[in-house]
Amino acid sequence: MSNYIVTFKDGVSKDEIQKFKDEVTSEGGEIGHTYDGLISGFSAKIQPQTLQAFQQQASISDSVIETIEPDSTVTIQ
């Protein structure tokens, strides 16, 4: 399992986001942090098959998913 940040387009309901979080956990993944400020989304350890399903969903033009990015540490020098 790898860590990813999944963000959603403006106007996506908390219930819709929860469906994606539930899918992560039902497939054995773990939710890390939930973002509900300037961006809506969550970080999670996601199983490969769940990641693939999310990526397919994100490729659809009317998808609610904005981005799926590998989670990483950002430093400022």
Describe each region flagged by the PLM.
Residues T7-D15, I46:
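Short, surface-exposed ligand-recognition loops at beta-strand->loop->(often short) alpha-helix junctions
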Residues M1-Y4:
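Short structural boundary motif marking the start of a folded domain
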Residues K9, S26-E30:
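Intrinsically disordered, low-complexity segments enriched in small/polar residues
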Residues I17-E27, A53-D62:
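Short amphipathic alpha-helices in soluble, non-transmembrane regions
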Residues G32-Q77:
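Autoinhibitory propeptides
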